[in-house]
Amino acid sequence: MILIGYNDAERIAIALNSLRDQSFRDIEIIAVDDCSTDSSVEVLQSAAELDPRIKVEVLSSNSGGCSAPRNRGIELATAPFIMFCDSDDTYDRHAVRNLHSAVTSMEADLVVGAAKRIVLNTGEEKIWRPELHATVQVFQGLRAEPGLLFDTISVNKIYRAEFLRENGIEFPSGLLFEDQLFTLKCFLAASRIGVIPEVVYNWNVERGTEDGSITQSRRELRNVSDRIAINQLMDAQLQSQPDLVHAKNQKFLEHELSLYLTTLFGLEEGE
C-alpha cells in the first residue's frame, strides 16, 4: 500500500490509520512524503516506530504532484500487489481483504473496487460510477467493457506489481490528473480486469472551498493545461482503437468538460 502526502500532517495520520487497521494484516505500507515543511514526516516516522509494516520515504525536493511519490513507492514496493492512497482519503477496513481475494481468485492483472465520494461539508455520499459495480465481473481486457474508462482514478484498485513492472507502467512526471493516463495504460495492457461491488475507498472532497485537493481546484491555469495534456496523451495511446476513443471522448464530455463549463459560468464578473 503506497500512501503519499504533502503538508497534510493531520489528515495523513487518519489515512495511515485506515491502512494500519485493515482486517487483512499481512501488508506493506510505504509512506512517501513529497518534501513536506509541516510535521507530516514526524507523524509518519512516529507511526513507523510502532508498526514495522510501515516504511517512510521522504523525497529530497517537492515534485508538485502525485506522480513522483507514487512512482517512488512502486520502486520501493516488495509486495506482490500494489494499492495507492492519498493523504486526504481513507480505505474501508476490509478493502485489502476484498481486493486481494478478488485479484487472486480471478487471476486478474488488476481489480476495480467501488469508491465512495464523500462531500465533507454537506455529508453527501455517492458511489462513483455505480453502474460499473452492480455485480462481480471479470472482463477479458478493456474492449470487453469500454465503460471502465469512466473509472480512471487509481486509488480504488489493486494491481499485480509484476504486471506494472513488466509493462513499464508508471505515472507521468510533471502532470496533474496523472491517474487517467496511468489507469488507461493498465486497462490497455491487462488481459483480465476484475470488478467488485464492495466499497473499498472513501474519496473525500469539500465543495466550495479554495483549499481543496489538486483535482478540486479547477480555476488554476495549470489544471486546465495539464488536463488537456493528459487527454492528448490518452488519445495517443488509443490512436489505433477508434471504438475505445469514442468511450474516452464520451467520458471527457460528460465529466471533465462539464466541470470546467460549470466553473466558467459560475465565475463572478472580473474573475
In which residue ranges do the predicted regions lie?
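Amphipathic alpha-helical repeat scaffolds of TPR domains
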Residues: 251-262
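Membrane-interface aromatic/basic loop that binds lipid-linked glycans or pyrophosphate carriers
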Residues: 266-271
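All-alpha amphipathic helical-bundle segments outside canonical DNA-binding/catalytic cores
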Residues: 242-251
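Nucleotide-sugar donor-binding/catalytic module of glycosyltransferases
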Residues: 1-236, 240
